[in-house]
Amino acid sequence: MKRSIAFVLFFAVLFSCNEEQQKPETMLVPSANETADMNKAWNQEEQELIHQFIARKGWDMIETESGLNYLVYKNGTGAQAEPGMKAMVDYSISLLDGTELYTTQSSGPRPFQIDKDNVEQGLHEGITYLRVGDRAKMIIPYYLAHGLMGDHEKIPPLASLVFDIRLLGLSD
């Protein structure tokens, strides 16, 4: 018994002496220019993925200056949406790979105040291109959606979103 304990202790001491002390890792913080360059590269890569997605779908979308893409595929005849109005919408939200994340199909239409409520920035912009009764596809890049963090529920970090949306009504 003493022999086995001595044997185990000998190897424990032997192997512990050979281990190098690990130095704490130094965390390098990127400069403002490096951060801007990383964001620019991410944005360009994301726009490329979005353009490839649009080409695969064969959609003739309009791209806005901000990077939002939209296509009205069914025209309504109602009033034009404007900032400050309350919009009532039906929608489904999915990722570029087709994974459906959210839909109003089970919860019912969703109201939000344009340019006021806490919804995706791209939705605030995109809804202003619609009239009551319009059905549209919108591709909202991650930087106009939930950004670097996602929504901590279903939307992952850096995720561009595909909205299939119908503007049901507007009120002041």
Model regions and ranges:
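Sec-dependent bacterial lipoprotein signal peptides
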Residues: 1-15
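Cross-family detector of peptidyl-prolyl cis-trans isomerase
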Residues: 5, 17-172
